[in-house]
């Protein structure tokens, strides 16, 4: 079962459409027990990190997400969903996040248009099944003003250049996190979802 986390925010409709387009079934849920019984979990995100963290904590989902990472249940976190996995963010002053991944979320540098809104290149830093059928340098769709800076550089799966060469994708065991929106990134975005589901579920749908 695929669980799509509903914490009162996030890009649920677009993500749901992407899952359906690939022929998979999912459950939209805010129930921690249901999330921890899933075979794969998607944590979407749009808007402010502080609001996302507050929404997760209000429903007890922060602890559920920490636990599923401990249990090595496959997790795909998107955009702000990725950012809140880290220790803290500069957004809104200094906001404490979930602390699942060591590192800080920083504002994009002065000198570039903020937010970054549009297509940009993904430079693959590792060979991984997540990238199967996706050429290095493929463009994906971004909407963000902040980026994650992991303390452990070994978890950086891909980078993107926008005033700074930033981490745009994390691979840490079965935790995948993207700064870009795969569900808004056309056929290659769907391919990334498909690769994630294949890693998590095998050939089941």
UniProtKB/Swiss-Prot annotation:
The keyword Hydrolase applies. Its EC number is 4.3.2.10, 3.5.1.2. InterPro entries: Class_I_gatase-like, GATASE, Imidazole-glycPsynth_HisH. Its main location: cytoplasm. The active site is at residues 79, 181, 183. Pathway: Amino-acid biosynthesis; L-histidine biosynthesis; L-histidine from 5-phospho-alpha-D-ribose 1-diphosphate: step 5/9. GO terms for molecular function: glutaminase activity; imidazoleglycerol-phosphate synthase activity; lyase activity. It catalyses: 5-[(5-phospho-1-deoxy-D-ribulos-1-ylimino)methylamino]-1-(5-phospho-beta-D-ribosyl)imidazole-4-carboxamide + L-glutamine = D-erythro-1-(imidazol-4-yl)glycerol 3-phosphate + 5-amino-1-(5-phospho-beta-D-ribosyl)imidazole-4-carboxamide + L-glutamate + H(+); L-glutamine + H2O = L-glutamate + NH4(+). It is found in: Cytoplasm. CDD domains: GATase1_IGP_Synthase. It comes from the Bacteria. GO terms for cellular component: cytoplasm. Pfam families: GATase. Heterodimer of HisH and HisF. IGPS catalyzes the conversion of PRFAR and glutamine to IGP, AICAR and glutamate. The HisH subunit catalyzes the hydrolysis of glutamine to glutamate and ammonia as part of the synthesis of IGP and AICAR. The resulting ammonia molecule is channeled to the active site of HisF. This is Imidazole glycerol phosphate synthase subunit HisH. It comes from Dehalococcoides mccartyi (strain CBDB1). The lineage of its organism: Bacteria, Bacillati, Chloroflexota, Dehalococcoidia, Dehalococcoidales.
